[in-house]
Amino acid sequence: MKLSLAAALLGALAVSAQTSTECNPLKQKCPADPALAGSADFGLTSESPRFHATGGTPTYGNDGASLTIGKRFDAPKLTSDFYIMFGYVEWEIKAAPGKGIVSSAVLLSDCLDEIDWEFLGGDPNQVQSNFFGKGDTTTYDRVKFHPAPNNNQEFHKYAVDWTADKTTFYIDGQNVRELTPDAAKGQYPQTPMRVLAGSWAGGDPSNNQGTIEWAGGETDFSKVPFTMFVKSIKVTDYSTGKEYVYKDMTGKWESIQAVDGQVNKSGKPGSGPKVESSTLPSSPSTSAHVPVHTVPGGGIGNPQAPNTGSSPSNTLTNGPSSTMTSLVGLPSSWIVTETGTGGVVTPTSAAESTSHHSDYTSRSSRSVSSSVSASSGNGGHGMTTSTGSGSAPTGTGSLPGSGSGSAPGYPVPTGTNGGGSNNPTDGGASPTSPAMQAPGSTGAIHSVSNALLLSFCAIAAWALV
């Protein structure tokens, strides 16, 4: 697969727009992460209370959870209500077909450590593996490609064995990639992770051309439905205790405390006490983490559904302190809000209520909000949404470039296909790269807001004359 530089850069941005965090413990004090603290086999032939659905309504049957894109802007996703601190996760998946359709299986932490499997519907014979540390997107040599024949016609098992010393990727039990902290060059994922799976349309015609090209081409929505099946998810948490707490803001695994337990550097899949898949966390502090919504960054996404086809305004407001604007170069209908540090988050569905808005999309220090979803509560975490559409945004900033809101100086992706060999060397290599953050967005927002206010006043004064 060969991509232009624009496709690589904007495609990377599109993928990063899918992962986010509600409260980043490297920047502020956050609630504890409820632990699985054992092993569980989640057969998804029926709904599991331990996985929360957003961006669409899954159905359940013999093939497991059906995550269906039935219309434009659907982006169904399952997110666990628990975390693991080193462990093993195996997703049994049949990826969604369709040009431009992206299926993902992801581990994601509150501080944006991330481990991904990603499938492109237009390329049913390979899968991509990827990783990120603390949301760092300064290099584009982390992804690898692996043979995965007929992945949208047949079920296969995609697993990650994540320890302090090594992360191993498996396809149907075969080791296809190993990642060590040294190979990760300081970006090794090492903080408590949630488990996710979902799909979205990277080929939506309102997205940037680079995003569409990365996803494999423009999606033809006359061919819906596009369905990803998740038959089961097996999870082992190698550590113990009722919850995980960040003792400081270093993001090192040694700084993670297991309350009433211990952090174990490694373990064995299936080990530890068996956790009933229907059992909800009982720790008093977990209520702040039960997903009241949420997505994609680097991995799974949630460019979730707008409910109108109208064009969004360039600058929107929702509440007294959440001015939002779009940035040139962002995928369509993603805008930036000043109530945070800036970055990329995907839209949330207008159909989702307040009780569905704090899990994956809103769990973000990349405080970006969508212009396409209805206003909803945000649990006090600075994430805002308002009604709009999926058309391509305009605004300040450029990609790449300089100035407020721009994403300057991104390197050209280099490297080769990781292939599917056993024990491949790591570091990743690919022209595609999830997760590109848009820095400096807060200043851009203030500039745009002030400029619009001055313009409005000037027009009003002129009219009076």
From Swiss-Prot:
Biased composition, class Polar residues, residue ranges: 304-325
CC terms in the record's Gene Ontology section: extracellular region; fungal-type cell wall; side of membrane
Listed PROSITE patterns: GH16_2
Cellular localization per UniProt: Secreted; Secreted, Cell wall; Membrane
Biased composition annotated in UniProt, kind: Low complexity: 277-287, 339-348, 361-376, 383-397
Known glycosylation sites: 264
Propeptide: 442-465
Lipid moiety-binding region (GPI-anchor amidated serine): 441
Region: Disordered, residue numbers: 261-325, 339-442
Signal peptide: 1-21
Modification(s) after translation: The GPI-anchor is attached to the protein in the endoplasmic reticulum and serves to target the protein to the cell surface. There, the glucosamine-inositol phospholipid moiety is cleaved off and the GPI-modified mannoprotein is covalently attached via its lipidless GPI glycan remnant to the 1,6-beta-glucan of the outer cell wall layer.
GO biological process, one term: carbohydrate metabolic process
Active site: 114, 118
Cysteine disulfide links: 23-30
Entry-linked InterPro entries: ConA-like_dom_sf, GH16, Glyco_hydro_16_CRH1_prd, Glycosyl_Hydrlase_16
Catalytic activity as recorded in UniProt: Random endo-hydrolysis of N-acetyl-beta-D-glucosaminide (1->4)-beta-linkages in chitin and chitodextrins
Binding site for chitin: 118, 200, 211
Recorded GO MF terms: glycosyltransferase activity; hydrolase activity, hydrolyzing O-glycosyl compounds
Record family assignment: Belongs to the glycosyl hydrolase 16 family. CRH1 subfamily.
Function: Dual chitinase/transglycosylase that plays a role in cell wall architecture. Chitinase and transglycosylase activities are coupled. Required for the polysaccharide cross-linking at the septa and the cell wall. More specifically, transfers chitin to 1,6-beta-glucan in the cell wall.
PANTHER family assigned: GLYCOSIDASE CRH1-RELATED (PTHR10963:SF68), GLYCOSYL HYDROLASE-RELATED (PTHR10963)
Name this polypeptide is given: Crh-like protein ARB_05253
Organism expressing this protein natively: Arthroderma benhamiae (strain ATCC MYA-4681 / CBS 112371) (Trichophyton mentagrophytes)
